[in-house]
Amino acid sequence: MFFHAHPDDEALLTAGTMAMLAAEGHRVVLVVATAGERGLADVEPGEELARTRTAELYKSAAALGCARVVLLGYGDSGLSSDGGVAGDRPDNAFIDADSEEAAGRLAKVLIEEEADLLTIYDPAGGYGHPDHVQVHRVGGRAAEIAGTPVVLEATVNRDPLLKGLRLAGRFYRFPAEFDVRAFERAYTPGDAITHRVNVRRFARQKRASMEAHATQAAGGEGPRTLAVMLKVPGPLYRLLFGTEWYVRRDLPAGARLTHPFDHWPRS
C-alpha cells in the first residue's frame, strides 16, 4: 500500500516502484489523503479542481497497475508562501485531522488488504509540506495499529539533488523566492537511505503517471516541476528518474538494499 498526500505525489516519488511491484504480481493499493484541491493549477481551486485531480489520479493509478484507489477525503491544507501551513485552510484540512482517528481509518484499509508493506514519507515530509508531514505521522501510527510488518519512507537522495541544483544555479537564474539552501534540510542524506530501487525498466509507466496529472504541469507564473520533468528525453529520463529511494527505520542506515522486500542481512 502506498500512502500519499495529494494526487501526483505518487507519480513523483513512488510510481516506478508501484509499477514494478504490480508487474511482479503484487496487489498494489494507492491511498491518498486529499484531492489536492488547493494546489497550483490553471483550474480554479476548489471542487472543480478536486474532481479534475481525482480523475487524473485514477488515470495515473491505471497506468501503474494499481488494483485499488482509496481517497480518505480530507481537505488539502495548502501551502503558505513561506512553506508553512496556509492560514485560510478548510475546516476538514488534513493537517488539522486528529492523527489517531486518521490513523485508524488508514489502518482499517491496511487490515482489509492484509498489506505487508506501507510507504509513507520521511519525518520532514520531503520538502516540508504540512500534509506530507501528516502522512508520516498518520501512516506510521496506522502501521502500528494494523501490525503492518514493513514501513518504507519514500524520499529523495539529498546529495545529488543539492549538487544538481547548485550546478544549475551557475547557468540558470532561479526565481527570487527559490532558496537552494532550503534543500540542505529537505529529504534524506544518502548515507541514511536503506533502499535504492532501480525502476528504469518501468520508466514508460512512470512517465505515463506523470503525464496523467496534466493540471500539475501548468499554472503559476513560471515552469512547473512536473512540466520540466516531462520535457526530459527518454534516455536521460531513465537515468535521472530511474532510481527511487526509501528509508526503513528498523534497518541499519548502510543497508543499501535494492528491492522493497529485501531482507537484512541478506541471506
PLM regions and their residue ranges:
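Metal-dependent de-N-acetylase/amidase catalytic core
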Residues: M1, N92, D96-S267
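Active-site rim/loop-helix segments in enzyme catalytic domains that contact anionic ligands
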Residues: M1-E114, R141, I145, V247-D250
